[in-house]
Amino acid sequence: MEVHERMIKRLVYRVSDIRPYINWLYFYHTWSMNGKPKEEKEKLRVEAETMLDEFETRYKTYAVFGIFDANSDEDDILIGDVRLPLLRQQRAKDNCSPHLCLSDFLRPLSSCIKDKVGAFATTVDTGMEFDYKHDDFRQMMAKVLAERLAEGTAEKMHEDVRRTYWGYAPDEHFTPEELHREMYQGI
């Protein structure tokens, strides 16, 4: 699909659509499980999978993305009549490498050639975080899983944008683990 001027889409996913995209490494990190016995991790994972099964019939995840014509003008990004002022990297550098800015990655306005910029947001049904308020452990588990599902939704949406909506990598087939390792080219 060719993107003209702008495209805005809202996507709705089932929990089962997102489960393969959950990064369990960060799930364990949130629970401070690094260095813990494998049995403890497996027990926690079983509890998480059980809760995800509960989520399947009750909740969804959501993504919205937009792809817009854009150009750069010095440190700013221009999207239609909107000017987004941006900062260059601020940290001191020991070598001669440049202080980059997001605008450096777009064609300049002076080129008279439109470029593209994208933006997205993801979320989950709010009940995931608030329906377990009478059980501290389950509430914490729900919040951690909601965070992982929102992140997994971003991974799934990113794949869908690349393969379907923007369509510049329609034949690309990566596993969720390969996507987590950013083995793709481009955005």
Set out the residue ranges of the language-model regions.
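Intrinsic structural disorder
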Residues: 1, 110-113, 151, 170, ...
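Short terminal or interdomain "cap/linker" segment that borders an active site or interface and mediates
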Residues: 164-187
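Active-site loops and adjacent core secondary-structure elements that bind or stabilize anionic groups
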Residues: 1-140, 144
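Short alpha-helical basic/polar micro-motif
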Residues: 147
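Charged, low-complexity helical/coil segments in non-catalytic cytosolic or luminal regions
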Residues: 150-164
